[in-house]
């Protein structure tokens, strides 16, 4: 159960996957929700069952981001939006992949924080939840995506320090591989996408939502800083070894 001091929330990337699952859970808890996404098709359908606000917005449009979000006064920010473009690594990512994914995964997060957090501090109440990743905590073969999520990890840590004493909490959720549409966008090769999402039992969106709800259930004196959640069959880290096929013998 969400701490009763929180009455309203903004969820970015609410139209699918983890954001959508969390939206439904918030609505069941009677939280006033602003659901933001570029694609609002599923949100429109859900709006026939529940009362909530939809913000149709591409987070790459920074000017519109500030125009829309500066109007809001909320208690919970779930900065969940992200894309997988470029996740195949620096050797395969295009220039556009790098630019667009950096804008969405990293820059828009900072702009969203700037638009929302000062009002939380002024109101002396709030909880910021940032969507990180195991790829941001452990080196993996994903220089682009891993680097961006590594930046989110540092942003979360620094924000927590910056907001000390403000009564605004900061939590970073770091999931492992989760059954969402991530791989479809991350890999141009369908075979690679299928391989990435197979071989073990994946997390599901509801598992990540459980972690979000846990962080939001704590008393004011308790701040869950980082939640690292992986599938039971997934062990992050490790030491992969790839022998060189044509070593230089000198």
Label every PLM stretch briefly.
Residues 15-16:
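Conserved glycine-rich cofactor-binding loop
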Residues 158-168:
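Active-site-adjacent segment of SDR/Rossmann-fold oxidoreductases
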Residues 84-99, 144:
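Conserved mid-core segment of classical short-chain dehydrogenase/reductases
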Residues 172-173, 191-238, 242:
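C-terminal helical subdomain
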Residues 133:
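Residue(s) in the substrate-gating loop at a strand-loop-helix junction
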Residues 113, 148-149:
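Active-site helix of classical SDR
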Residues 113-114, 157:
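A short, exposed helix-loop element centered on a Lys and neighboring polar residues
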């Amino acid at each position: 159960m969400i701490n009763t001091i929180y009455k309203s929330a903004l969820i970015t990337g609410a139209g699918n996957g983890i954001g959508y699952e969390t939206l439904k859970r918030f609505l069941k808890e009677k939280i006033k929700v602003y659901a933001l996404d570029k694609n609002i098709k599923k949100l429109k359908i859900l709006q026939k069952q529940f009362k909530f606000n939809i913000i149709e917005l591409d987070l790459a449009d920074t000017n519109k981001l500030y125009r829309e979000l500066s109007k809001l006064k909320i208690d919970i920010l779930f900065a969940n939006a992200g894309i997988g473009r470029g996740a195949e690594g620096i050797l395969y990512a295009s220039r556009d992949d790098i630019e667009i994914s950096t804008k969405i995964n990293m820059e828009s997060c900072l702009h969203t924080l700037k638009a929302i957090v000062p009002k939380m501090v002024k109101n002396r109440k709030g909880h910021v939840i940032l969507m990180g990743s195991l790829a941001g905590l452990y080196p993996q073969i994903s220089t682009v995506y891993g680097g961006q999520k590594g930046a989110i990890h540092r942003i979360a840590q620094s924000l927590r320090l910056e907001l000390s004493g403000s009564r605004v909490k900061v939590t970073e959720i770091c999931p492992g591989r989760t059954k969402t549409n991530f791989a479809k966008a991350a890999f141009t090769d369908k075979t690679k996408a299928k391989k990435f999402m197979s071989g073990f039992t994946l997390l599901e969106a509801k598992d990540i939502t459980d972690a979000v709800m846990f962080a939001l259930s704590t008393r004011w004196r308790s701040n869950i800083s980082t939640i690292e959640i992986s599938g039971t069959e997934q062990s992050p880290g490790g030491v992969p070894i790839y022998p060189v096929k044509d070593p230089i013998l000198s």
